[in-house]
UniProtKB/Swiss-Prot annotation:
Keywords: Cytoplasm, Phosphoprotein. The lineage of its organism: Eukaryota, Metazoa, Chordata, Craniata, Vertebrata. Residues 125-139 have a biased composition (Basic and acidic residues). This is Dynein axonemal assembly factor 8. Residues 166-175, 435-444 have a biased composition (Polar residues). The gene is DNAAF8. It comes from Macaca fascicularis (Crab-eating macaque).
Amino acid sequence: MASNDEGMAPSLGSPWASQTGPWDAILKAVKDQLPSLDSDSSLSDYGEEELSIFQRNQTALIPDLSEELAEDPADGDKSRTWAAAAEESLPEVCGTQKSVRLCVCNPALVPAELATEPGNRRNTRTKDASSQEGRDPGRPVETSGEVSAFLGMAEETPRWLGSDLGSLSFNTKGSQGPPWDPQAKASLSRHEGDPKAEPASQESVNRRALRQERRKMIEKDILQKVTRDACGPASSDQGGVKEAPCHAVESAARSKMPLAEPPEGPPVLSLQQLEAWDLDYILQSLAGQEDNQGNRGPGTVWWAADRRQVQDRTVPSADDRLMEQLALLCTMQSRASACAWKVPADTPQDTEEAGAGSRCSSRKPGSEAGPGPQLAQGMRLNTEPPTIFIDLRQTVPPDHLSPARSRGSSHSSSDSEEEEEEVEMAALGDAEGASPSSLGLRSCTGKSQLLQQLRAFRKGIAQPKLPANKGPGGERAQAPEDTAASGTVRKQHMKLCAKGQSAQARLPRGRPRALGDAPEPGAAREALMPPLDQL
């Protein structure tokens, strides 16, 4: 390197040196204050012009091994070149016949003198190791930034010794071949008692102590807890101590476990048992809690049973309600089309209820004309929802209307013709007070209106003709002209007035007169039924 430096440095007699004279003086004055590019070689012995970072040879870029090779006289020569080992997978055998050393390099840097062919590898390593044996037979050769372990192996009891870690060594049982032979069985063991390795393996001793403490903690705190929880359900019925059987099971499992298995076997076995026992343990613990809390368990069972019964009742009730609605619709249509001889049987359900209420109130003396419209209006408010049975949009269950239906039918069978006339008179007063505007304001669909008109027309055709002396408006029209005319002429006049009023009552509803032959008492009775508009 000195020759290269001298060749690269300019000579003093050259014209280049004369031109750089002032710059050299400036450099000398400022050099002490400028930081060096290479801190280790800032004050170099080679001269001012040497910059070791740029003038270094390519072979010098290998990590500096001067500290490791300073004590070795054979390796003290700095002109020795280094090369990487040709075989990285196989360890290098470098030792004598008594103690053979193995160097595992990944990747290792060994001198070129030692990197020879595999055929005469053992002889060359023996010669080199014999020269180094007097110096330090147990010291390994290390490289900066890489870990290389020399593993000593004797003929009788060979061992692999780790230099840096110093805690692990692999014992080879009864095999004279190399340790990487598949027939050689390696087992984990500790290397202790080497006084030279004690200062270097101080960290390994601490690690070993930490591992032992951790293993003890796992065995005491975790394994015993797992086995105790697993054995708890089995011994809960007996009521004895739970920990004793668990420890017995744990000791038995350890005794049955072969010696070749690692010490981490018990946790795996206990975890496998825990997976099998988890569900049973949860069920038994819940059963024990329910027994301790008293009647909570049966209560929950009863609640679940009641809930099932409620569900069983509510699910068919919806179907039953729908079937009742369909059956009611069918009966209403059959009643409208069939020939009925009594008014309460022909009227729908809400009109039956209204008629029954009006009949009950009309039985009292002096209440023939006054309470009729009021009761009709009250019933109209109570039975307001339109098209309940036609569109099957029922807001109130039909069970509430069944008593009224039965009461209406009983009254219809037991009432006399005089009560029928009183009901017709009360309905006539209500029909006269009602206006077409009030009927049009009610919320009903077009379909419901058409069905109402069709039902009213069919009922008007099916109703029989009543006698002349029992006309619908006879007694009511008789009151205003009571003092003006005689008996026979007055009856005939009342018949004509009743016919005119029935015709006027049919016209505002938009029903054509051609559908009916002539204004008959039956048609007048049909017009006197306000609840028909509410269906």
